[in-house]
């Protein structure tokens, strides 16, 4: 089944999504991290990155917010590049836990591996795997360069957010040392946790995340810079991880209602990948009870449903002028 969509259609639907959703008052800012609690709750932006490099934007698409857990996708890509898909499967895994993203119980139940790079335990383990082992500065450079390559522009560390995160990350400290107990962290636990905390504190925009999603959708080639960031054979690995655990224990509901693999973060960002078609991101700080942006979810669902797109419907989608 073939489906053609014009760029003007996408522009119209993105604008409609913004107008439909911007007045929604549901959810509240994350209050357990002081920096996030104080961000303007009315901020809202959407960006779609087409595979020709064109971005379609509306609202606060260029506001820098904390990337938070969306960064897990980026570092998963980095270790897939450095180690290969099979080694990552063996050292971390790719399975959903069915439990909250910061669960310690998940480690106790399945201590043979941290289960997936897209939950906290697996993400801390992923940071420990980044090479060169034992060199915090060079590991950090690799993490930032990878995000820059994916987004097409450099993220900026939000120092206030980093300090807030570091002062309140008691649960993650427990996770790091529990991983050490089970030999599932591959560098110094404190270093690995600090790298994870710092990467979550990087400031990005909805437009940047849409380009990163577009890079995944485009087989590893950044649509804007045209740089081959990773091998195309990794796209299905990355997309499957996002589909199964991008919304944590609610990933099934998300996939059923939206039809697009997407990753969420408590900073208010959501990044979605439609392979071969486009990358999309939306940002708004108020979150639902599971830590997912209310407006971003509604906006992306609106775009997908209005355009009649779904990763599972088997359609070959062509975007035309």
Curated annotation (Swiss-Prot):
One GO term in the molecular function aspect is: glutaminase activity
One Pfam family here: Glutaminase
Name the enzyme group at the top EC level: hydrolase
What are its E.C. numbers? 3.5.1.2
**What's in the keyword line of the UniProt record?**
Hydrolase
What InterPro entries does this protein's entry cite?
A: Beta-lactam/transpept-like, Glutaminase
Catalytic activity from the UniProt record = L-glutamine + H2O = L-glutamate + NH4(+)
Q: Could you give the subunit structure recorded for this chain?
A: Homotetramer.
What NCBIfam families does the record tag this protein with? Gln_ase, PRK12356.1
Which PANTHER family does this one have?
GLUTAMINASE, GLUTAMINASE 1
* Family label: Belongs to the glutaminase family.
Instruction: Extract the HAMAP family matched here.
Output: Glutaminase
Q: What is this protein called?
A: Glutaminase
What species is given as this protein's source? Bacteroides fragilis (strain YCH46)
Identify the coding gene.
glsA
């Amino acid at each position: 089944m073939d489906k053609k969509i014009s760029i003007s259609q996408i522009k119209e639907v993105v604008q409609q999504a913004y107008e439909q959703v911007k007045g929604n008052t549901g959810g509240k800012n994350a209050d357990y991290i002081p920096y996030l609690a104080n961000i303007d709750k009315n901020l809202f932006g959407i960006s779609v990155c087409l595979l020709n490099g064109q971005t379609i934007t509306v609202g606060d698409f260029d506001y820098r917010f904390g990337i938070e857990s969306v960064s897990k996708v980026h570092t998963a890509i980095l270790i897939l590049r450095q180690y290969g898909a099979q080694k990552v499967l063996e050292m971390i895994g790719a399975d959903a836990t069915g439990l909250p993203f910061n669960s310690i119980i998940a480690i106790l139940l399945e201590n043979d591996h941290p289960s997936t790079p897209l939950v906290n335990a697996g993400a801390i383990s992923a940071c420990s795997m980044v090479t060169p082992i034992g060199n915090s500065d060079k590991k950090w450079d690799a993490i930032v360069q990878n995000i820059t390559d994916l987004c097409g522009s450099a993220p900026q560390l939000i120092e206030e957010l980093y300090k807030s995160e570091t002062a309140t990350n008691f649960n993650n400290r427990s996770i790091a040392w529990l991983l050490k107990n089970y030999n599932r962290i591959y560098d110094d636990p404190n270093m690995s946790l600090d790298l994870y905390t710092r990467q979550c504190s990087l400031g990005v925009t909805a437009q940047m995340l849409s380009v990163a999603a577009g890079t995944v959708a485009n087989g590893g080639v950044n649509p804007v810079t045209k740089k081959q960031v990773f091998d195309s054979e990794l796209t299905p690995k990355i997309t499957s991880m996002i589909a199964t655990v991008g919304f944590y224990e609610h990933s099934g509901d998300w996939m059923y209602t939206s039809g697009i693999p997407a990753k969420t973060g408590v900073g208010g960002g959501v990044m979605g990948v439609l392979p071969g078609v486009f990358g999309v991101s939306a940002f708004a700080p108020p979150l639902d009870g599971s830590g997912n942006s209310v407006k971003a979810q509604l906006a992306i669902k609106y775009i997908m449903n209005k355009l009649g797109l779904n990763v599972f419907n088997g359609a070959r989608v062509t975007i035309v002028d």
